[in-house]
Amino acid sequence: MYDIKWIRDNPEVFDQGRKRRGLEPLAARLLELDDARRGAIAKLQVAQERRNAASKEIGQAMAAKDQAKADALMAEVSALKRDLPELEAAERAAAALLDKALSEIPNLPLEEVPFGRDENDNREHHTFGEKPRFSFDPAEHYELGETLGLMDFETAAKLSGARFVVNKGPLARLERALGAFMLDLHTGEHGYTEVNPPILVRDDAMFGTAQLPKFENDQFWARPGAHPLLIDMFGREEAEEMKKNRLWLIPTAEVPLTNLVRESILDEKQLPLRFTASTPCFRAEAGSAGRDTRGMIRQHQFTKVELVSITTPEQALAEHERMLSCAEEVLKRLKLPYRVVTLCTGDMGFASQKTYDIEVWLPGQDRYREISSVSVCGDFQARRMNARYRPEGAKNTRFVHTLNGSGVAVGRALVAVLENYQTEDGSIIVPDALAPYMGGITRIEKPALERPNSEKPVSRA
């Protein structure tokens, strides 16, 4: 969220940043709204000051035994008191219009971010690993999972509808192992503090990380004691009351982890703070109709290990590179080939100043697919959360800078392991990095199959 004072002082810079995102100029309109707010504040202050002055003059007139003047002043004060609620309402309305407009503005890209319209203009940063070579046509993950009898979309659809899955047996254990491996790596070697946060959060938390109001229709929400769809049956007042009591299912652990510092003032010596969590995540995928309708790539519910850092402005860019390397290390340990791309201005997320995507190679699809996004957000989220820190030796506070990244998406990591570690008979070799978590299971296969002497399909450096 941007400071209107900064926009007033830098309207051309602001509009130029929007242009790089492919957006229309907006500074003039925002300054009109700010002028209206400032005008409403001025009118309210004039009325309040006159009320206070007239109230004081009443006492003076009474002391001077000037009843006529006192009566006139009392009438004036009464009129001002009648007018003040309307002036206060006008000030609140003007402020609300400005706040709404500001809350819907995306973050501006850093100068180093490549210009572009969409994902086709993203730039490859670097690659890691060699793509596996198979002596057979590699299958997609859902073909492998269903053939093994361990990935069940039909039952999931009966339970919950489309875009859900039931994983069973050693496949469920493999998914659990992936999450545990990631958490152990990030906490044991990368210095992150593990957190087990709520997965139901209030509006303020979703606003703080900028999921609201822009992406309200992409989220799932619930209200104790009433189905959310019943909102259409109520009037405006009842609907607003329901909204006050609603809770949101988190689309990412970025929401609760980043909001751990909302409405707080930290000491500089505490920074950077680094948090990680493995949570279920929930997304409506409202804009994804017809995309990835089969398999686990795009689900309403999925597990993700999240990384969040809270830093000073001076630490933020170095922390961004560090977070990227932490996420990459997951795939390196799993020996999964991947590439890193720098997102262009037209493909960046709403709250991001700069984003790297890590895309893992999926042989079954014969393409790279996103498995992690790592973003630096500047003070964009901190302003929405009112999260500050006090520099050493300083009286005034500054907004912290926030960063977030997937470390990584557990479901997509499972997909990548299935496709990269498949064998010709359809069984799956368990990556060496996951062996400590699998209770002796080194190969996932149909219960009736016994292939103890099968070799891995490809050597992995």
Swiss-Prot record:
Catalyzes the attachment of serine to tRNA(Ser). Is also able to aminoacylate tRNA(Sec) with serine, to form the misacylated tRNA L-seryl-tRNA(Sec), which will be further converted into selenocysteinyl-tRNA(Sec). It comes from Methylocella silvestris (strain DSM 15510 / CIP 108128 / LMG 27833 / NCIMB 13906 / BL2). Keywords: Aminoacyl-tRNA synthetase, ATP-binding, Cytoplasm, Ligase, Nucleotide-binding, Protein biosynthesis. Its EC number is 6.1.1.11. The lineage of its organism: Bacteria, Pseudomonadati, Pseudomonadota, Alphaproteobacteria, Hyphomicrobiales. This is Serine--tRNA ligase. Residues 112-134 are annotated as: Disordered. Pathway: Aminoacyl-tRNA biosynthesis; selenocysteinyl-tRNA(Sec) biosynthesis; L-seryl-tRNA(Sec) from L-serine and tRNA(Sec): step 1/1. ATP binds at R283, A284, E285, E370, I371, S372, S373. GO terms for biological process: selenocysteine biosynthetic process; seryl-tRNA aminoacylation. Disulfide bonds: none annotated. It catalyses: tRNA(Ser) + L-serine + ATP = L-seryl-tRNA(Ser) + AMP + diphosphate + H(+); tRNA(Sec) + L-serine + ATP = L-seryl-tRNA(Sec) + AMP + diphosphate + H(+). InterPro entries: aa-tRNA-synt_IIb, aa-tRNA-synth_II, aa-tRNA-synth_II/BPL/LPL, Ser-tRNA-ligase_type_1, Ser-tRNA-synth_1_N, SerRS_1_N_sf, SerRS_core, tRNA-bd_arm. Consists of two distinct domains, a catalytic core and a N-terminal extension that is involved in tRNA binding. It holds the Pfam family tRNA-synt_2b.
